[in-house]
């Protein structure tokens, strides 16, 4: 079987590429980032092709803080369309194309004309559903609505219609597609894995402190205001809340209204630095109102750090409530505060949750279960027989 991938930047697609390569399925992965960045993903260069100039330039300009939203929107739209045109010209015949959502429409049609299958890989909820949730949250906090990008919804929905299948990382994401009219039989839930070689326990949380961690984009979509309000209610003489990640523009006008005592913002950290923070934290809290399946949950669990999360994070596909952590309703400040207080006041509970986390991620086999589920889906869609000999990675 020959499988090709298209992806903006990296996301989880290089983990998938490794799984496909080990099974002998990977033909090529096309990315909009340069090889200088992609080589750290550890995939042989012969499998990687890049269309990097436009995306790299847009990213660098964006980091200056001087790129107007309208210009950023135009450049990203241009990048999306030209990347799709480029991959459509370059792609060799294959049995299946896996494209991160937003990419691959023209390329997918070409693959289908040549007898292959086109799979849209969506990392979060349905685009229209997502935009409705985020717009409502902006209104709730008196923040101007997000810059309208109707072309994104139009393109995404055209891709959903064209694709032979849509993969999502969680049941909650699949439900959003069904709510927006996509047939359930077109959807396939394939939860993400975790790199156990990079995320593992390296420290023990300080028993004299209560360290709470948040990791990810620090904005309204991630439910950050609810975490700050809840943390302020936690009673502990030496409590600390650390935010790892970049503060989003939509939160900047809201932050001054929120309690921030004993709160630290570190900015973005490297994966080794993040793993160290996770190992040293008593709990990670992710109160998102919309997501797909937050990778940081599995990463924290692999470090022995219990998780408090909302269903919107995809938590229900990753861990069990009151076993490896706690699942609380979205926007529920009382529930967040109660569960944090529980862990702060009961070291034995925290230890039980931590040990359960390590058992759970070990059972997932890193990214291997993810690869197995993709292997099953690809064989089902293409109808191609499995190799009679098991691949070497199982030996």
Describe these PLM feature segments.
Residues 172, 193:
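Carbohydrate-associated surface elements
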Residues 203-233, 242-244:
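Conserved donor-binding/catalytic core segment of Leloir-type glycosyltransferases
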Residues 289:
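Aromatic "clamp/platform" in nucleotide-sugar-dependent glycosyltransferases that forms part
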Residues 41, 58-74, 114-154:
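Acceptor-binding helix/loop patch of EC 2.4 sugar-transfer enzymes
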Residues 252-272:
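Nucleotide-activated donor-binding/catalytic signature segment of Leloir-type glycosyltransferases, i.e.
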Residues 306-309:
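Short hydrophobic beta-strand element within catalytic cores of glycosyltransferases
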Residues 160, 268, 276-281:
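Short alpha-helical donor nucleotide-sugar binding micro-motif in glycosyltransferases
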Residues 321-322, 326-333, 342-347:
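Conserved acidic donor-binding segment of nucleotide-sugar-dependent glycosyltransferases
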């Amino acid at each position: 079987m020959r499988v090709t991938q298209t992806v903006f930047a990296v996301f989880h697609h290089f983990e998938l590429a490794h799984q496909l390569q080990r099974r002998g399925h990977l033909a090529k992965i096309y990315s909009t980032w340069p090889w200088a960045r992609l080589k750290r993903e550890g995939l042989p260069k012969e499998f990687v092709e890049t269309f990097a100039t436009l995306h790299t330039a847009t990213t660098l300009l964006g980091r200056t803080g001087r790129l107007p939203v309208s210009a950023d929107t135009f450049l990203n739209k241009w990048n999306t369309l030209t990347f799709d045109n480029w991959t459509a010209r370059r792609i060799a015949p294959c049995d299946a194309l896996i494209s991160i959502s937003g990419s691959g429409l023209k390329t997918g049609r070409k693959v289908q004309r040549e007898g292959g299958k086109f799979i849209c890989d969506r990392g979060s909820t349905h685009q229209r559903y997502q935009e409705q949730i985020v717009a409502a949250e902006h209104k709730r906090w008196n923040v101007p609505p997000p810059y309208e990008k109707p072309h994104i919804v139009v393109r995404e929905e055209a891709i959903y219609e064209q694709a032979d299948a849509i993969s999502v990382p969680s049941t909650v994401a699949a439900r959003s597609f069904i709510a927006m009219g996509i047939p359930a039989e077109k959807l396939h839930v394939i939860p993400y894995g975790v790199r156990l070689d990079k995320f593992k326990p390296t420290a023990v949380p300080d028993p004299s402190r209560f360290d709470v961690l948040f990791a990810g984009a620090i904005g309204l979509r991630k439910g950050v205001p609810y975490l700050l309000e809840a943390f302020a209610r936690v009673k502990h003489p030496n409590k600390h809340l650390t935010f790892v990640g970049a503060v989003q523009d939509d939160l900047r006008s809201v932050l001054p209204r929120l309690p921030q005592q004993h709160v630290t913002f570190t900015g973005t950290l490297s994966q080794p630095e993040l793993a160290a923070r996770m190992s040293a934290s008593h709990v990670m809290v992710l109160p998102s109102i919309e997501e797909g399946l937050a990778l940081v949950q599995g990463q924290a669990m692999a470090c022995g750090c219990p998780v408090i999360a909302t269903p919107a994070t995809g938590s229900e596909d990753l861990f069990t409530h009151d076993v490896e952590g706690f699942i609380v309703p979205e926007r529920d400040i009382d529930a967040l505060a109660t569960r944090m207080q529980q862990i702060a006041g009961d070291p034995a509970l925290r230890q039980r949750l931590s040990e359960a986390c390590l058992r759970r991620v070990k059972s997932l086999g890193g990214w291997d279960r993810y690869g197995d589920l993709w292997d099953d889906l690809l064989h089902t869609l293409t109808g191609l027989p499995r190799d009679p000999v098991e691949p070497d990675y199982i030996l």
